[in-house]
Amino acid sequence: MTILDTIKEYKLKEIEKDKKIISVSRIEELAKAASPVRNFYAAIKHAQKDGYGLIAEIKKASPSKGLIREDFNPEKLATAYEEGGATCLSVLTDKPSFMGDKDFLTNARKSTQLPALRKDFMYDTYQVTEARALNADCILIIMASVSDQQAEELEHAAVSWLSLIHI
């Protein structure tokens, strides 16, 4: 079993649990009520006029390195990244492998004017809608972890905002 297989196994269980806590219809309501989308793509393109667009990552831990930062504060990191010239944020929300949290995304985005990407392992359109409900401006679809059909479904679910595909 590969690491992606392990992640997929726990993610599918997590998604089913989440759907029991917040129904699909309720998460759709929350997504519609979310703050306006900040255009991730436009921010990168605009920044490239002056050289490059920097996507700054907010990550507490990783499977390979373990805990990266003990004094982890997503809001302070987001603010520091913005002040340091970052163009966009990438916020890890996966808990088991990266010690992430959905609140990290919401709070980091709230503390800046930067567009924010939800970096997680996406397998279900529920997660896409949930990302928008959390005020994500963009999602990441990791192509190595989904079928082409799943990727199309996820991208279609994010059609009104921007999705990135990571191969």
Residue positions per predicted region:
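An N-cap/entry alpha-helix motif that binds or orients negatively charged groups
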Residues: 2-69
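Short, charged beta->alpha transition segments
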Residues: 39-43, 74-80, 118-119, 127-128
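Active-site-adjacent beta->alpha loops and helix N-cap segments on the catalytic face
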Residues: 94-108, 121-129, 143-157
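Alpha/beta enzyme core
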Residues: 70-89, 111, 130-137, 151-154, ...
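Conserved small/polar residues in nucleotide/adenosyl-binding loops
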Residues: 165-167
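A cross-family glycoside hydrolase active-site/sugar-binding cleft signature
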Residues: 55-59, 92, 117-119, 142
